[in-house]
């Protein structure tokens, strides 16, 4: 199927409306799992972005050494310290037992140090069994996990290097070739893929969408973590990984453009987080 570029009208449909009489928790509960001794900021970016995307509650699971800094970053995050400094099987099992009732979506991998890949499988399988919609990024993008997420309404968000590690194939340089490869692999593995790049390619194997919103300043570290948080926040309310990923890519790009307009080539990922309310407000709908 031919790929097509998304626009504002698509995003307006993909971002769910909110009931005027809704209560806390009914607009999405998100779990963010990430971080390490070196990369403490990644899950913070994702968590703040998820909150700014419009969900109600964000639970942020980080290594216990990172917990104080994560709590200090925002009083809005509910921080869950992991039992170990890296994701071990024991830490994964304990976290699975702490998952709050009614969790809608989870994003895993941003800056995450994984001691053993079987630990990732333990956590992912537990979440899938609870009907939690899952988005995987960065450290969680390993081939061993593909069998566990196939046909489970899951999203992966690799850049080109992570894409090769995950699928064993390098995406072509031309957009037509990239779109064709992403669509084929999404269909083959029963997942939704968001291949990040100057033009993002999003496919669930049936539909393939493109996003060209963004700015040169977005090469700064952390913008991919922001994208993961937005995707998880929307996925908590929209059960379609394709629509959630496409909307997130577009909105992330809009925030990057707005940040560059304000700060030139001197932005940070937190600038994108702070601009999310203004770029998302036009897509707000109340029922």
Curated annotation (Swiss-Prot):
<comment type="subunit">
    <text>Homotetramer.</text>
</comment>
<dbReference type="GO" id="GO:0005524">
    <property type="term" value="F:ATP binding"/>
</dbReference>
<dbReference type="GO" id="GO:0110051">
    <property type="term" value="P:metabolite repair"/>
</dbReference>
<feature type="binding site">
    <location>
        <position position="224"/>
    </location>
    <ligand>
        <name>AMP</name>
    </ligand>
</feature>
<protein>
    <recommendedName>
        <fullName>ADP-dependent (S)-NAD(P)H-hydrate dehydratase</fullName>
        <ecNumber>4.2.1.136</ecNumber>
    </recommendedName>
</protein>
<dbReference type="GO" id="GO:0046496">
    <property type="term" value="P:nicotinamide nucleotide metabolic process"/>
</dbReference>
<feature type="binding site">
    <location>
        <position position="225"/>
    </location>
    <ligand>
        <name>(6S)-NADPHX</name>
    </ligand>
</feature>
<keyword id="KW-0547">Nucleotide-binding</keyword>
<dbReference type="InterPro" id="IPR000631">
    <property type="entry name" value="CARKD"/>
</dbReference>
<feature type="binding site">
    <location>
        <position position="42"/>
    </location>
    <ligand>
        <name>(6S)-NADPHX</name>
    </ligand>
</feature>
<dbReference type="InterPro" id="IPR029056">
    <property type="entry name" value="Ribokinase-like"/>
</dbReference>
<feature type="domain" description="YjeF C-terminal">
    <location>
        <begin position="7"/>
        <end position="283"/>
    </location>
</feature>
<comment type="similarity">
    <text>Belongs to the NnrD/CARKD family.</text>
</comment>
<keyword id="KW-0521">NADP</keyword>
<dbReference type="GO" id="GO:0052855">
    <property type="term" value="F:ADP-dependent NAD(P)H-hydrate dehydratase activity"/>
</dbReference>
<keyword id="KW-0520">NAD</keyword>
<keyword id="KW-0067">ATP-binding</keyword>
<dbReference type="Pfam" id="PF01256">
    <property type="entry name" value="Carb_kinase"/>
</dbReference>
<keyword id="KW-0456">Lyase</keyword>
<feature type="binding site">
    <location>
        <position position="159"/>
    </location>
    <ligand>
        <name>(6S)-NADPHX</name>
    </ligand>
</feature>
<comment type="function">
    <text>Catalyzes the dehydration of the S-form of NAD(P)HX at the expense of ADP, which is converted to AMP. Together with NAD(P)HX epimerase, which catalyzes the epimerization of the S- and R-forms, the enzyme allows the repair of both epimers of NAD(P)HX, a damaged form of NAD(P)H that is a result of enzymatic or heat-dependent hydration.</text>
</comment>
<feature type="binding site">
    <location>
        <begin position="196"/>
        <end position="200"/>
    </location>
    <ligand>
        <name>AMP</name>
    </ligand>
</feature>
